[in-house]
């Protein structure tokens, strides 16, 4: 795990399973209809139960650039923040959607008083973007929201290649190498 400190906030890149992270909230790179079929959304639904999708669908449609929050069902995370990267399931997306979704998720987490949030590669996978690109967009969103996002943002990579891509994207966005992480962060991943 590598960390970048922005004021009193920490942005981390970690390898793991988003459905097992013990952050207060996890982010679902949703579609505007809130259908949780494939990718990270499908994994969150399978692990946390259909109640997550049912709650989210009651709030649909949600445009790209906005986010909604639901319970975490039976996930270790208390909440799921649904931030659409696409209008309909299975769409290829432009890079700006990864930024808009990341920004919306972090802004909502801050407004809800959430202290720790875990995010997958928003827009990679089903959306068709590279992990490095979407990690750069997430880091840029955090940088713009400086001081107005949760204490911990954890970008969760599935596998070594995705981890390297996330690390590269964050490094490009922030212009510095990541370093050691606070000891209390390890309990979340």
UniProtKB/Swiss-Prot annotation:
Coiled coil: none annotated. Pfam families: Macro (PF01661). Disulfide bonds: none annotated. PROSITE patterns: MACRO. It comes from the Archaea. Residues 1-174 form the Macro domain. SMART domains: A1pp. This is Uncharacterized protein APE_1648.1.
């Amino acid at each position: 795990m590598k960390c970048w400190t922005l004021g009193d906030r920490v942005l981390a890149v970690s390898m793991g399973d988003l459905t097992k992270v013990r952050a207060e909230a996890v982010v679902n790179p949703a579609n505007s209809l809130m259908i949780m079929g494939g990718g990270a959304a499908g994994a969150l639904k399978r692990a946390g139960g259909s109640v997550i999708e049912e709650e989210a669908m009651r709030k649909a449609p949600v445009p790209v650039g906005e986010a909604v929050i639901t319970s975490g069902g039976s996930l270790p995370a208390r909440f799921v923040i649904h931030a659409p990267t696409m209008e309909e399931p299975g769409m290829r997306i432009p890079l700006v959607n990864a930024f808009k979704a990341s920004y919306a998720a972090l802004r909502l987490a801050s407004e809800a008083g959430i202290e720790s949030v875990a995010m997958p590669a928003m827009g990679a996978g089903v959306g068709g973007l590279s992990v490095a690109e979407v990690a750069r967009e997430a880091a840029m969103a955090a940088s713009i929201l400086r001081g107005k996002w949760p204490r911990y943002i954890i970008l969760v990579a599935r596998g070594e290649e995705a981890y390297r891509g996330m690390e590269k994207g964050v490094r490009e966005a922030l212009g510095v190498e990541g370093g050691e992480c606070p000891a209390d962060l390890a309990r979340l991943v």
